[in-house]
A protein has these predicted regions:
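Outer-membrane beta-barrel transmembrane strands
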Residues: 190-212, 216, 220, 294-309, ...
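Outer membrane beta-barrel
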Residues: 54-74, 86-215, 224-255, 336-338, ...
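Outer-membrane beta-barrel proteins
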Residues: 74-78, 120-122, 141, 161-166, ...
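Hydrophobic alpha-helical segments, especially transmembrane helices
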Residues: 3-4, 157, 356
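Alpha-helix capping and helix-loop boundary segments enriched in small/acidic/polar residues
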Residues: 184, 221-222, 407-408
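N-terminal periplasmic/intermembrane-space "pro-region" immediately following the signal or transit peptide
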Residues: 2-68, 114, 139-142
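Acidic/histidine-rich helix-loop elements
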Residues: 78-86
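Outer-membrane beta-barrel pore domains
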Residues: 27-38, 83-84, 129-132, 246-254, ...
């Protein structure tokens, strides 16, 4: 009886938090140019569209934000029986501050600050970038035909490798993730980068370069090589008819350095979305448990992403492989994921679905095979375009390849989460 009361109290608290915030986030939509709306309208938007959907009259600053609150009821265990006890309660709320500024016709600035995060309780700048869709600030009509299909992006921010990063939770911006956790191998990093995107008649092409560094520094030592990271994407995205949309992309990322290019699966400074899990009674806790980072140097990664939407049915998949060089051990990991959703209601404001995610491979050739599986089942309700509440059951298992004295040996965590979100 007490457990049921806890659940009811938690649900009431989360719902009350949402409805109190909904007054300030009623279907807000900006008229910024070439912009992905930070609302339900931004669902299933990947690269920013090449339709302006706004006119430039003067410099315009749009201040927005994200807020996410969780109730977590997860248990964990391992073969050593040396993990901390977990209860059912509210996690630390997370919040983002978003500043988007239209500087000129076709010239826009984005800046995001994590006001509160699992990994940083204090305010912490995630990154920012400038997006250029017109070059009229150089000269009216400059390269006009090219810029009708091209977007130039430069900054210190997340770069466009793969499609999964468009659907992930970015600290408190959880609106586009139908579940609570991100994928086990979470391909996301913020680095100094520049990229060019071409979109024409459904064709998508991206080519870009980063400096391969998450933490910037000009200090060098005997191991510094400062190798650049190169990445790209080719794909096709078409609304075939009113009911059917098809998208298929393939992306690659490559860095031959020893001191750079190691952050592709460890670049998120917000922290994972599951709290307290797999924390040993002795030893330091990690804010990133539940994820897996190969920590490869001289890596090459490839990610293939199918996306299909037919009426309310939606499928998104990941086929991904990352490997390092022969000198570094010739290791390799493969990630597979499939996410199936059914969106329903007059505006598809409700959804139900499931996700299966697995990572397997080895750190060095002929080494012990590691295998991790996760299942998510849940659903959500968009109370308005800017307000979402979601419920999930999840189960993650560390299946193979962990040493007898590792806390991951026989490891498992499973349970229920309620997550409430406001984004505007």
């Amino acid at each position: 009886m007490k457990k049921h009361l806890t659940w009811l109290s938690a649900g009431a608290f989360v719902l009350a938090s949402l409805t109190s915030g909904a007054v300030f986030a009623q279907d807000q939509e900006t008229d910024l140019q070439y912009f992905r709306q930070n609302s339900k309208e931004g669902l299933n938007v990947f690269e920013t569209p090449k339709e302006a959907k706004g006119t430039f009259e003067k410099v315009k600053v749009v201040v927005g934000g994200d807020f996410a609150l969780q109730f977590q009821s997860i248990n964990h265990s391992n073969a050593l029986n040396n993990l901390v006890d977990l209860g059912s309660n509210i996690n630390l709320p997370t919040a983002n501050l978003n500043i988007n500024t239209q500087l000129a016709d076709g010239l826009r600035l984005h800046l995001r600050t994590y006001l509160s995060a699992k990994h940083h309780n204090e305010a912490w700048v995630k990154g920012g970038h400038m997006q250029i869709d017109k070059l009229d600030f150089i000269k009216p009509g400059f390269l006009e035909e090219f810029m009708k299909v091209a977007t130039i992006t430069v900054g210190m921010d997340e770069f466009n490798y793969g499609d999964a990063h468009f659907r992930r939770s970015d600290n408190a911006r959880v609106l586009f993730n139908p579940f609570v956790g991100n994928y086990i191998m979470d391909s996301f990093s913020t680095e100094a980068f520049g990229e060019v995107t071409i979109q024409s008649n459904g064709f998508i092409g991206v080519v870009g370069v980063t400096n391969g560094k998450l933490n910037q520094s000009v200090v060098v030592n005997s191991t510094t090589d400062n190798k650049l990271s190169f990445y790209g994407k080719l794909g096709f995205d078409k609304q075939i008819n009113e009911d059917f949309r098809f998208r298929l992309t393939g992306s690659w990322y490559m860095n031959n350095g020893l001191s750079t290019g190691t952050y592709l699966y460890g670049g998120d400074r917000g922290g994972s979305r599951y709290y307290g899990i797999m924390q040993a009674l002795e030893g330091t806790a990690s804010d990133f448990e539940g994820r897996f980072n190969p920590r490869f140097k001289q890596m090459t990664a490839i990610q293939i992403n199918p996306f299909i939407k037919f009426k309310g049915l939606e499928f998104f998949g990941i086929i991904e492989n990352v490997g390092n060089s022969e000198d570094q051990g010739n290791g390799s990991f493969t990630q597979l994921a499939g996410e199936a959703l059914y969106r329903f209601g007059t505006t598809e404001q409700f959804y139900l679905g499931g996700r299966y995610n697995t990572v397997s491979g080895n750190s060095v050739e002929n080494g012990d095979d590691i295998k991790i599986n996760r299942v998510n089942i849940g659903g959500g309700w968009f109370m308005t375009n800017n307000v979402l509440i979601k419920l999930e059951y999840m189960n993650q298992q560390y299946k193979e390849g962990f040493a007898a004295d590792s806390k991951y040996n026989g490891g498992e965590f499973k349970g229920v989460n309620i997550e409430a979100a406001i984004s505007f």
